[in-house]
């Protein structure tokens, strides 16, 4: 192995957060600016040391959207991974070739005003919205798109469209 392929994957978790109406939360990355392409994503973040992935996803939700008013619906039982493009590897100091992720489906139990992007000192997101699960692959940066396509398939049962 040479170059980026010799680097390890960074372990992290992702949250597919569904409203009671079956929509999924997407948030706009604050560091890319409002006019950037593919600036919307699902909450995700690193696993600290030997932290349990289920605990990590709750911590990440608190850090990124200011709430843990959720219930676990399901998870993808295996690790999903993607490789960063070369410019992203370089941007992060060539420490990781990409990310390996555990994805969780969760139901939001609170009200929209409980989602607070400014709950912590350095917000990752500057805007959020509820959207259709089927729309998330088109919102994702191309290197994450296969993961979001998998989420749209595997978590479709949590995306009720009857307005309930």
Curated annotation (Swiss-Prot):
Its EC number is 3.6.1.-. It is an enzyme of class 3 (hydrolase). Keywords: Hydrolase. Residues 8-153 form the Nudix hydrolase domain. A motif (Nudix box) lies at residues 45-66. GO terms for biological process: nucleoside phosphate metabolic process; ribose phosphate metabolic process. Pfam families: NUDIX. The keyword Hydrolase applies. GO terms for molecular function: bis(5'-adenosyl)-pentaphosphatase activity; guanosine-3',5'-bis(diphosphate) 3'-diphosphatase activity. Its cofactor is a divalent metal cation. NCBIfam families: PRK00714.1-3, PRK00714.1-5. Belongs to the Nudix hydrolase family. RppH subfamily. Accelerates the degradation of transcripts by removing pyrophosphate from the 5'-end of triphosphorylated RNA, leading to a more labile monophosphorylated state that can stimulate subsequent ribonuclease cleavage. This is RNA pyrophosphohydrolase. The lineage of its organism: Bacteria, Pseudomonadati, Pseudomonadota, Alphaproteobacteria, Acetobacterales.
């Amino acid at each position: 192995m040479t170059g980026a392929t010799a680097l390890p994957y960074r372990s992290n978790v992702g949250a597919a957060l569904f409203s009671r109406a079956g929509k999924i939360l997407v948030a706009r990355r604050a560091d890319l600016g409002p006019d950037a392409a593919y600036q919307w994503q699902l909450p995700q973040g690193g696993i600290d040391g030997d932290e349990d992935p289920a605990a990590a996803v709750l911590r990440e939700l608190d850090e990124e959207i200011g709430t843990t008013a959720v219930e676990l619906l399901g998870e993808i039982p295996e690790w999903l991974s993607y490789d960063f493009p070369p410019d992203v590897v370089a941007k992060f100091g060539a420490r990781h070739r990409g990310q390996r992720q555990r994805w969780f489906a969760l139901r939001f139990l609170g009200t929209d005003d409980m989602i607070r992007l400014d709950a912590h000192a350095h917000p990752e997101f500057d805007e959020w919205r509820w959207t259709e699960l089927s729309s998330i692959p088109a919102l994702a940066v191309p290197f994450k798109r296969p993961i979001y396509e998998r989420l749209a398939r595997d978590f479709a049962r949590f995306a009720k469209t009857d307005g309930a």
